[in-house]
Amino acid sequence: LMGFAAREALHIASYAHLIETLGMPDTTYSEFKEYEVMVEKHEYFTNTVNNGLDISIKMAALSAFTEGLALFSSFIMLLNFPRHGKMKGMGQIITWSIVDETMHTEGVIKLFRTYIEENRHLWNDKTKKQIYDIAEKMVDLEDKFIDLAFQMGKVEGLRSEEVKQYIRYIADRRLISMGMRGIFKVKKNPLPWVEEMINAPTHTNFFENRATDYAKGALKGSWDEVWA
């Protein structure tokens, strides 16, 4: 969990660097408060975490439907720029963020399933209904956010309905990974190019940059060998 937190700190620094590079003012950080849809997203998440729900439901809400869902509509819309050869540096940030958030989601869902396995009395119809309700609400909030984002006009190579279907596809994947059934019935990835961009190997000029792909090989051996 500390590793997850460290990655989140890197995400904050990365997006702050992006905003500064684009010359956007500091007020940008609070401008989301001017949009009812974004305020509703923030308040719903805050209320879900701070209310009296069981820790298992909070884990599901945080991992599956916040890190694992609510961020992804923004990720997809931003990743569409480097897909068309624009803002490639930002595309790297988004790609790494998706990889990290997916790892966080999978990690906490594994923790959720272990917790449920050790507390079987909690896994009942009431708990399942609460999780399904959260999933449906989060998807509804993302629909509103996507509509807001597309109000400015058409986006090259991307339609709002495609993003909405992708969110439903992701939501079902999260539910299934928690041992539940998918309720949005989107079995095929509507945006296959997303997977292609995320999974593509990082190629970089050795003298200008360095690759940042995760590598299993780096986890083998001993600490003595690392510093040899």
Task: Give the residues covered by each predicted segment.
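Non-heme di-metal
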Residues: L1-A228
